[in-house]
Amino acid sequence: MPPTVNMGIPGASRSIVENLKRKRVLLAEPRGYCAGVDRAVETVERSLRKYGPPVYVRHEIVHNRHVVETLERAGAVFVEETDYVPEGAIVIFSAHGVAPTVYAAAAERNLRTIDATCPLVTKVHNEVKRFARNDYDILLIGHEGHEEVIATAGEAPTHVQLVDGLAAVQQVVVRDENKVVWLSQTTLSVDETMRIVERLRQRFPKLQDPPSDDICYATQNRQVAVKAMAPECELVIVVGSRNSSNSVRLVEVAMGSGAGAAYLVDWAKDIDPAWLAGVTTVGVTSGASVPDILVQGVLKWLAERGYDVVQSVTTANEALVFALPREIRSAH
């Protein structure tokens, strides 16, 4: 059983490597699949079993190349818009959510829809609708062009303004400073988001907070684990795809928390051996849309190069499970 470095679970122990010079890996816990991703991927898998291929999916079901390619081989067809789906066919909406206009377009073509939107994204959609009904200006902190942001803003486009970074704060214009609320994309850096909120509040002192955290539990947990291990790491390897917002944020968090270097890789083969020069401790984690088989591939690659001591850095335990969409709950 590998030694454990526990940074947040009561009653757990911290084992010390006898030879501190020995090459080692710090493995972040939690990492990888979150409840929303697990639900979305299983939705596609069960739909393929229930209805048979092809099953159409609007956009990548989650932002991970391995997952998408695996589902494509099983018969999933990924399309950018519902226009590419044959009339009357089944289409699954990705974990990132869709705007009401997408539902309307699907209905016009008699498509049978299955919604794999993460329930935590749906929560933000509901917040947008509620604040829009009360005629608030909604400042949505997020990344321009990200599918989740497009979908969330689409719930109330006349009320939502995107705030993409600190520089965008100065461009915000509101109608009534007493009726302003901020919401956020679920996969952002917690620290960066709060810096933006602080700047917004300097401009709008009566800025309201969301009813509850919009940044999801899994995003926060993975960032906390990286923060805990980064100061001890000369190198952090984040397994994840470049179009995965939460994976990219983990690289940023690692660098901002004291790691000597941090890189994003899809697979073990993407690792440059030159990164290991002079490195004793390597941190490893993965984004919320990454299956653990890819992390195991990285650990094997590192072990072959002498990094054969693996210590878990545990900051939280996760047990959340979301119910599947009703259309496929009976499929096994």
UniProtKB/Swiss-Prot annotation:
**Per the UniProt record, which EC number(s) apply here?**
1.17.7.4
CDD domains hit by this protein: lytB_ispH (cd13944)
Tell me the active site: E148 (proton donor)
Pfam families per the UniProt record, alphabetical? LYTB
Entry's cofactor comment? Binds 1 [4Fe-4S] cluster per subunit.
User: Please, which domain of life does this record's source organism belong to?
Assistant: Bacteria
Identify its protein family: Belongs to the IspH family.
Q: Can you name this protein? A: 4-hydroxy-3-methylbut-2-enyl diphosphate reductase
Organism equals: Mycobacterium leprae (strain TN)
Q: What is the lineage of its organism?
A: Bacteria, Bacillati, Actinomycetota, Actinomycetes, Mycobacteriales
State which gene encodes it: ispH
